[in-house]
Amino acid sequence: MKTNLLNYDLQGLTRHFADMGEKPFRAKQVMRWMHQSGAQNFNEMTDLAKSLRHKLNEQAGIEIPKLMMSQKSSDGTRKWLLDVGTGNGVETVFIPESDRGTLCISSQVGCALECTFCSTGRQGFNRNLTAAEIIGQLWWANKAMGVTPKNERVISNVVMMGMGEPMANFDNVVTALSIMLDDHGYGLSRRRVTVSTSGMVPQMDRLRDVMPVALAVSLHASNDEVRNQIVPLNKKYPLKELMAACQRYLVKAPRDFITFEYVMLDGINDKAQHARELIELVKDVPCKFNLIPFNPFPNSGYERSSNENIRVFRDILQQAGFVVTVRKTRGDDIDAACGQLAGQVQDKTRRQQKWQQILIGQQG
C-alpha cells in the first residue's frame, strides 16, 4: 500500500524522505506543493528531479478525501461534505465575517461523548479521522476559497469545533495542527487556531505541553448537577477539575483567556441563577463567554432559550466584567449551524430509536 503523505507533518515528512535516502529540504518542497499550491500528484512538482517524482509515484500518494457535496448558504456560509469511506461523510463549514474567515473542522466520524443537546452525538461514534482526513478539510476549503485581492488567504482562522471531540483523537489532531501552523503548510498563527473540548482534562494538559493553540471549552452548565445531565463526560472530570485544567492551560496558551461556550437551553441552564453561579465558577479563570442559542433538531427534547432570557443572562455576565458574545445563527438553511453537523454517519448504535423511546416515555 502506498504511503499517504498528507498524513505527515514536516517532522514526519522529513523522516519519510530520510528513509528514502533523500535530503531534508525535499520534505519542505513537497509540503509546500501539497498545502500551499494544492498539488494532488507529484508530477505537478516541477522543482523536484524527474527521478524523485518517479520514485514518489511508485511509493507514495497524496490522497485527499473526495468531495461529495458543496453548499452555499444565503448568508455566505459554505459547507463541504467529504467522503471518508464506507459510506461515511464528514462536514466542514466556512463562516465569513467582515474581519476574518473561519473554517470549522471535524475530527471524528460521529462522537462518543453523548452530549444530550448535540445532533452529532445522537448519531453515535464510528471512528477517528486520520490526520490526512482532518487536514484534507482545510485543503479543500483553501482550494475553494482561494485568496483575497490583496493575495491574502480567505481562511484566516480555524476552529476544531465540527463533528467529534478533538481531544479523543489526540495524535491525529496534533499532527493536523502542526501542518496548519507550519510556514511550509498553512502558516496560521497559534492565536488563530482554536481547539474545542468538552473537558478531557488529561488531554488538555498534553495539548498545553505539545501544541498550545487557543482553547475553547464546551461548558454549557454552571454546576455539576446540570452538567452531569447534559454533558456526561462531567461525571469523569467534574467542574472543579476542569477549572483547574483551564488555569494550567493558560500558563502556555497563546491567548490570555479561555473561551467558554454555553448553549442556551430553555428551562435547563438559562436562568439568572445559572448566570450568577457561572460568575462564581470561573472567578479564577480569565475567560470570555460565547452564548449559543440552541439549534433545535428532531427528537432533541430541548427548546431554544427565549431572546429575553438570553439577553438577561448576557447582561448579568457583562455587568460582572466578562466579555460576552451571543453567537449569530449562521448557515441554518444548509444545516451548518452549531450542533447540526450530523453528516452522513451510519447510526450503528441505533441511538435515534433510543432517544425517541425516552421522549415518548417522558410524554406519557
UniProtKB/Swiss-Prot annotation:
Catalytic activity field: adenosine(2503) in 23S rRNA + 2 reduced [2Fe-2S]-[ferredoxin] + 2 S-adenosyl-L-methionine = 2-methyladenosine(2503) in 23S rRNA + 5'-deoxyadenosine + L-methionine + 2 oxidized [2Fe-2S]-[ferredoxin] + S-adenosyl-L-homocysteine; adenosine(37) in tRNA + 2 reduced [2Fe-2S]-[ferredoxin] + 2 S-adenosyl-L-methionine = 2-methyladenosine(37) in tRNA + 5'-deoxyadenosine + L-methionine + 2 oxidized [2Fe-2S]-[ferredoxin] + S-adenosyl-L-homocysteine
Subcellular location: Cytoplasm
Annotated S-S bridges: 104-338
Record-listed E.C. numbers: 2.1.1.192
InterPro entries the UniProt entry points to: Aldolase_TIM (IPR013785), Methyltransferase_A (IPR040072), RlmN_N (IPR048641), RNA_MTrfase_RlmN (IPR027492), rRNA_lsu_MTrfase_RlmN/Cfr (IPR004383), rSAM (IPR007197)
HAMAP family assigned: RNA_methyltr_RlmN (MF_01849)
Protein name listed in UniProt: Dual-specificity RNA methyltransferase RlmN
Species lineage: Bacteria, Pseudomonadati, Pseudomonadota, Betaproteobacteria, Neisseriales
